[in-house]
């Protein structure tokens, strides 16, 4: 089974004796793992819940952008190996870092209630993007954010920004950048909300699919773990991110493509926006749909409707050109 959202678990799951959580070792990743650990300890007081900290290839390769070194899967492969060989029972991820299609043998057992999905503007000297002078250097790790900046603020210089959250803030503080764009959720989770000078409007800068949500991955055959995790699952968040991830999956999206997808609940309906851009920001395609979403199938259908609309506008031409360019660049780097 490789489904994105789990079936409902039993009402009473036999409490586990031990559980091991695989996590990256960055401060934010460990906060997320500890958040899940604490929730599990509250559910199962007698359970010995441990965290297995791991360094992934994505954490080790800091001199190149993700789009040039293998994409978001670099952050999860080592954790999946720990799930496969039994060193860990579950792995906690920022859902935006999870590839749109999981490898065979793995599934998302729970998607937790979402934090703020927006992008955050962080600067020591300027109050907003609009306040930045021409030529100011803005750092971002995301092609999606880069495309937005090049489209809306062509007078700014956009440069890559890699490293964990603390490393990125340190680079800002030592003057490498006039401002940086980060996910608001990570800053808030680490108690760094005061660093946020402005939150970017989701209409102007739609976030990445799954941004702000935590996903808990397991080996697909571990029905016992899925049952234990069922109380952590937030159905409304899950349906929203299912729709978002479907947009990206249908278009073949990855970190090589500036692709955004954001869903929000309004008056009982799910409103979904998808956006695909060229990296220079000169071509921006946007599609919006809404509907009553009750089941995973409904969410996937809504995501497919948005991806179909983007395809009709020429999104696949953009995606294929970007992927071809990325592959050519990769061959040159080898």
From Swiss-Prot:
Write out the pathway annotation from the protein's UniProt entry: Porphyrin-containing compound metabolism; protoporphyrin-IX biosynthesis; coproporphyrinogen-III from 5-aminolevulinate: step 2/4
Q: Name one GO molecular function term.
A: hydroxymethylbilane synthase activity
Q: Which sequence positions carry the modification called S-(dipyrrolylmethanemethyl)cysteine?
A: 255
Q: Which GO terms describe its biological process?
A: protoporphyrinogen IX biosynthetic process
Cofactor(s) this protein cannot do without:
dipyrromethane
Q: Cellular component per GO?
A: cytoplasm
Which top class of enzyme applies to this chain? transferase
Keywords carried by this UniProt record: Porphyrin biosynthesis, Transferase
Q: What Gene3D superfamilies would the database entry show?
A: Periplasmic binding protein-like II, Porphobilinogen deaminase, C-terminal domain
SUPFAM superfamilies assigned to the protein according to its UniProt record, in alphabetical order: Periplasmic binding protein-like II, Porphobilinogen deaminase (hydroxymethylbilane synthase), C-terminal domain
Sorted alphabetically, which InterPro entries does this protein's record hold? Answer: HemC (IPR000860), Porphobilin_deaminase_cofac_BS (IPR022419), Porphobilin_deaminase_N (IPR022417), Porphobilinogen_deaminase_C (IPR022418), Porphobilinogen_deaminase_C_sf (IPR036803)
Give the cofactor note text. Binds 1 dipyrromethane group covalently.
Q: What does this protein do?
A: Tetrapolymerization of the monopyrrole PBG into the hydroxymethylbilane pre-uroporphyrinogen in several discrete steps.
Q: Which family is this sequence assigned to?
A: Belongs to the HMBS family.
The protein depicted here goes by the name Porphobilinogen deaminase
Q: Which organism is it from?
A: Burkholderia orbicola (strain MC0-3)
Source taxonomy? Bacteria, Pseudomonadati, Pseudomonadota, Betaproteobacteria, Burkholderiales
């Amino acid at each position: 089974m490789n489904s994105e959202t789990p079936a409902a678990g039993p009402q009473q799951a036999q409490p586990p004796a031990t559980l091991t959580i695989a996590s990256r070792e960055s401060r934010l990743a460990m906060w997320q793992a500890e958040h899940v650990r604490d929730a599990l300890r509250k559910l199962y007081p007698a359970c010995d819940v441990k965290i297995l900290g791991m360094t992934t290839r994505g954490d080790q390769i800091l001199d190149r952008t993700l789009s040039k070194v293998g994409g978001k899967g670099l952050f999860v492969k080592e954790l999946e190996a720990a799930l496969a060989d039994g060193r860990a029972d579950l792995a906690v991820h920022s859902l935006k870092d999870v590839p749109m299609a999981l490898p065979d043998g793995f599934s998302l057992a729970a998607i937790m209630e979402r934090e703020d999905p927006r992008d955050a503007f962080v600067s020591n000297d300027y109050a907003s993007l609009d306040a930045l002078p021409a030529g100011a250097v803005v750092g971002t790790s995301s092609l999606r954010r880069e495309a937005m900046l090049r489209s809306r603020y062509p007078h700014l210089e956009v440069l890559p920004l890699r490293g964990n959250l603390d490393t990125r803030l340190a680079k800002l503080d030592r003057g490498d950048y006039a401002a940086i764009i980060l996910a608001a959720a990570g800053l808030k989770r680490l108690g760094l909300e005061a660093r946020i000078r402005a939150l970017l409007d989701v209409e102007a800068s739609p976030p990445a699919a799954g941004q702000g949500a935590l996903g808990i991955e397991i080996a697909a055959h571990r029905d016992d773990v899925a049952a234990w995790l069922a109380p952590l699952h937030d159905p409304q968040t899950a349906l929203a991110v299912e729709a978002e991830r479907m947009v990206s999956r249908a278009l073949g999206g990855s970190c090589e493509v500036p692709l955004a997808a954001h869903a929000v609940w309004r008056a009982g309906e799910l409103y979904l926006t998808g956006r695909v851009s060229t990296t220079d920001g000169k071509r921006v395609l946007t599609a919006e749909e809404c509907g009553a979403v009750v089941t995973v199938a409904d969410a996937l259908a809504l995501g497919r409707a948005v991806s179909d609309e983007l395809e009709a506008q020429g999104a696949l031409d953009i995606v294929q050109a970007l992927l071809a360019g990325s592959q050519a660049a990769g061959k040159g780097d080898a």
